[in-house]
Amino acid sequence: LSGEEQGLFGGKILAKYAQEHDWRVHGVLNNDMIGNSTGINGVTDNTTARIFSEGTRVIETKDQAHKRRFTGGEVDSASRNLARYIDTIADRYIENLDTMLVYRLDRFGRGGHHRPFNDVGFAAVRIMETNENYNQQHQDLRTENGITYGDTIDYVDFAYAAKLTSLNAVTMASMAWAPAPPTGVSISGAVKPSTTLAWHKSDDPTVVSYKIYWRYTSEPKWQFSRDVGK
């Protein structure tokens, strides 16, 4: 997407177009940046990556915020669950890669093209390298005081970039194989020792079963699951 550094123009245009044309978007994976493995701090690490995701949705209504106050879910936005899913895929399929869930929209004072999609209600995350080198970002090509500035191909760790590209490919393939998410989902449990989940059963013949995941509220990742059939 173009115009990122000038004001996220490409993302804004595409997100608006997708919204106006009723695109069915289940997730946006913004890869920015995935090719550098040596940070300005001198650390070289090609075994980790970060996944940034927003908490509460920016389009949340006052009524939704009121309900969330009593039911929780501050760390259960669609974007954050997408990040958890990508992390699970990394653990399952990508060797020697540990993805770290970062509970923020982006780095402090920074932005990326996933944000315009969040702004209109789509689940979107930022996948990026762990260690950044700011001498290679937003710089004119030059050498000053023995320091080389600028983003050039010499600094690309292609093996690392391939690893994160593979993560994207496997994630998208896994999501594409899945049927549509259930509709009419509700949760209840007042004056009960347990929680009741309900949803509209799908008529899709490819749906053979539903699996429920849960975790302690203090845990970042899903801990438990149960297959409940169809």
Segments (PLM) and residue ranges:
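Active-site-adjacent mobile loop/cap segments within catalytic or ligand-binding domains
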Residues: 36-52, 101-177
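Proline-enriched interdomain boundary motifs that mark the N-terminal boundary
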Residues: 177-188
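An aromatic-rich alpha-helical recognition segment common to small helix-rich domains
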Residues: 182, 197-201, 212-214, 230
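Conserved aromatic anchor
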Residues: 193-207
